[in-house]
């Protein structure tokens, strides 16, 4: 479980986590499928779910899926004309952080290990393009001693692309196969990514296992 792994790693780094039990889907899928009202309704519900923690002094809203993080960072803009939510949405977007942003800012000695693993990183479009955090996961894993492979055309999409894999399945499959060929070229032990959509789409090919990068870090702590 990605969120559970993230909570354990953050705890090891001395960062307390307050789960927002009422928070749910960020709304991106519906919004991008032309159901904007439904997507924004989800955004409002999430704002309501997070607001008590924000009022209590929460320093960040941490997202483990880069697609969700990119969308939550847009809440302020998307709800700017809603008098009841505009200011709250702006505050939420300002506090939103991808997990890699939080981990990268911490000393990582507590997570270090002498056992290297050969890993290929797929950086999601929503991390490297939408959030402009390309290389963030690579940097963390390198600091932790993982052996990262060189991946050709790392800027290209894996084919998941939010709802694209649903609306254009044939092209999405070709993009996926091309991406996996690039990721597998240097024979990694496994592939990691930072977005559940990419992870699910790539794993659908049944080739090299694809996991969220924080699960790899968490597994090191457990073992």
Predicted ranges, named:
Residues 1-223:
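Iron-sulfur cluster-binding electron-transfer modules in prokaryotic oxidoreductases
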């Amino acid at each position: 479980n990605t969120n559970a792994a993230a909570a354990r790693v953050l705890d090891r780094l001395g960062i307390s986590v307050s789960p927002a039990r009422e928070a749910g889907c960020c709304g991106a899928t519906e919004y991008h499928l032309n159901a904007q009202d439904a997507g924004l309704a989800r955004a409002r519900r999430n704002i309501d779910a997070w607001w008590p923690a924000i009022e209590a002094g929460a320093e960040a809203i941490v997202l483990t899926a880069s697609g969700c993080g990119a969308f939550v960072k847009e809440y302020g803009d998307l709800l700017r004309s809603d008098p009841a939510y505009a200011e709250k949405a702006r505050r939420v977007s300002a506090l939103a952080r991808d997990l890699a942003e939080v981990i990268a800012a911490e000393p990582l000695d507590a997570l270090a290990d002498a056992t290297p693993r050969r890993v290929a990183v797929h950086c999601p479009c929503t991390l490297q393009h939408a959030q402009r955090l390309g290389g963030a996961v690579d940097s963390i894993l390198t600091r932790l001693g993982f052996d990262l492979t060189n991946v050709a055309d790392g800027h290209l999409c894996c084919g998941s692309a939010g709802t694209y894999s649903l609306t254009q399945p044939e092209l999405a499959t070709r993009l996926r196969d091309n991406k996996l060929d690039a990721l597998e070229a240097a024979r990694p032990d496994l592939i990691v990514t930072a977005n559940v959509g990419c992870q699910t789409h790539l794993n659908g090919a049944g080739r090299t296992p694809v996991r969220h990068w924080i699960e790899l870090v968490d597994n090191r702590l457990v073992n």
